[in-house]
Amino acid sequence: MQLHDLNNITDLVPVTESNQVTESNDITYGNGLAWDTPVHKEPVYFQDGSQNPMVYGIRLGDENKLLAGNVSASYELIHNRELVDVCVGEILGPSDIQFSHHYRFFNNKGIFRDIYYADNTIEGYVPVVGDTIRLVAEIINSYNGSTRAGIRFYFQRLECLNGMTSNKYGFECTFTHNKEGSFNWQDQIIRATSILRGSAQSKLNAFVQNCGKLQKPVDNTDIALIRERYLNRLPMQQFGQLMHKYYADKDYTAWGLLNAGTNVLWHPDPKNPKRLTNANFSNNTIVVDGLLQYATDTYDGDTVDPRQTDMFQS
């Protein structure tokens, strides 16, 4: 179990019944299987019929079971339904923040993402432009060991509903699926209740203040530097999409560059606007953390409002 970027862990607050989380009817599945379909960890056998002691198969469903992946013997199977029940009932519900369900994804490899948007109980405003930023909660899991399990929090620009994932400014309570003695993930993960109450506003404040440092013009030389040093891990296709959106939006600032990137990565398919892949999330983090690092490295105290400066008018 790891608590990332969280140093102010306080005593847990007793959990009470809450209806602070609402679920929409607009839920997306990846393959037709229900996200809480039965899942089993089953032995794998050699051709001679003997059991492989090192490998187990994770299979979905009760009949005609679908193989999600092979895992080690020490793999701890965590059911999506149980994880959601704990995260919603013990963390989001008692947090005094109203969360509404946005998106749920589950594919045939057992990758699970469940996303909730927070209300205005906690929000921040980007300096100069005043854009409103709020929290996003994401419950994550996998049945093939490819991702950690738990809950993480990052940000959303309200104006365009772009999600902004960040390893540096976000916070999370996640763990691997490997058994560790008497480790009880249910007991550990509810520590995120006090994390959410104690650290959310300060994390959000730090994020929006650094977004404020992006309110400055960037030219082709700056973009070349950004591409070479800060977005060098972003695939070429996604960088091309980012630049196309950047020029279309005509917000020729570093903030405009970030918003163009998060827009094409959070809304990659106009026909299916909630269709997101693991690559969308990881590339989103590359854009957000890369450009915020650029902002920190190059900040000189000068900012501009692209909506009030002649050089940015169409």
Short names for language-model regions:
Residues M1-K41, Y103, N120-S314:
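Intrinsically disordered, low-complexity regions enriched in serine/threonine
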Residues M1-N107:
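N-terminal low-complexity, intrinsically disordered segments
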Residues R81, K109-I111, I133:
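Residues at beta-strand starts and edge strands
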Residues Q98-I122:
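Beta-rich nucleic-acid/ligand-interaction surfaces
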